[in-house]
Amino acid sequence: MGHVEKEREKSRVSIVKVAGRDRALVAAGVRQAIELAGGMADLIRPGMKVMIKPNMVAPPPSADSGACTSPLVCQSVADVVKELGARPIIAESSARGADTEAAYRIMGYDDLRCLGYEVVDLKRDTTVQVKLAGGHVLTEITTFELVTQMDAIISVPILKTHDQGQVTLALKNLKGLVVDGDKRRIHQLGMFEGAVDLVGHFKPVFAVVDAILGQEGMGPLLGIPVEMGLVLAGRDLVAVDAIGGRIMGFAPDEVPITRVAAERGLGSLDESRIEVVGERVEAVRRRFVRCEEDDRIDSEGIKVIHSEGTCTGCRNGLLSSLFDMQAAGTLERARGTTVIAGPTPFPEGIPQEMLVSVGSCSLPEAKRLLRYVRGCPPNNVDIIRALLADDGEAT
């Protein structure tokens, strides 16, 4: 192929409608999406070990919350991989402090194990340190031995919003391939640059997005489920994320990780350079409620403040504590409180008695507050005690 012709080649992203959530319909939709996106026959060869990487951020409130990738989607991708003569392994490590096995159990991945599919909790695997050539903020990471043995990685996220980067899709999904300590370190060094460093290192070959049931609002765990009935697929993860974000109502350059990955040359952000096949974006898009627009907690008179350095474990623990209090009818007692999560600067003009600080990585002045909750991640019971002003510092 000539240089000019190669430059004109577009990234292809498929969008396929799925008529329901039963096994046969999901399998047909996933297969069609993969085929429309160019298939994987030239990427996956007989004898290869192929990691299928779902998004299992943490144990979700339910299997229908839109927080975690459906096992039916992963099963369908695994079947395609097996047909190509390769060995598919579904593997994940959930957010810092989160129980991957509990997430698998709630979502129904144990059923796949019963059927003979390999489903691995990476947190139980041996860890290894590897160097990152060309990393912008990461020069070394600790990953898992199984990951280093893979011949190819397929990112299989779910379509959802995120409280730090607008959305979390195929690119950010790779953060689950490092140990909990590095997940936290990435947030502290710069989440978007760090996540793109991981993409550049692991080089996923394909993405299949579970957009059958997504999540809007306070993602990545405690948002509101959204029925979309779609599957997206493509080889260019930047293009896949750009189109996935567009379907949710986000311009591609609004999403920091997509923008950074494109700037590094990892894929196409320019929609004029992306060929969408199957359904048209205009026909399926739906503006998702953004995290800052989800006022379920703000309406209760509680203000939550976090920064890019606040990791998923802290944010999820805090929000789940607030929703637990809301369900128990005790959130009213914390009205007027401002909660600072992780290494986040103090807001001005708020009396210290109305502040709660959460997380062992809090700034020194935050740790001196009467209501400071240590822990990485902090325990929900301790967070609730602090919010209710029970016994001062929680440990």
Model-derived features with residue positions:
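N-terminal and secondary-structure boundary signal
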Residues: 1-395
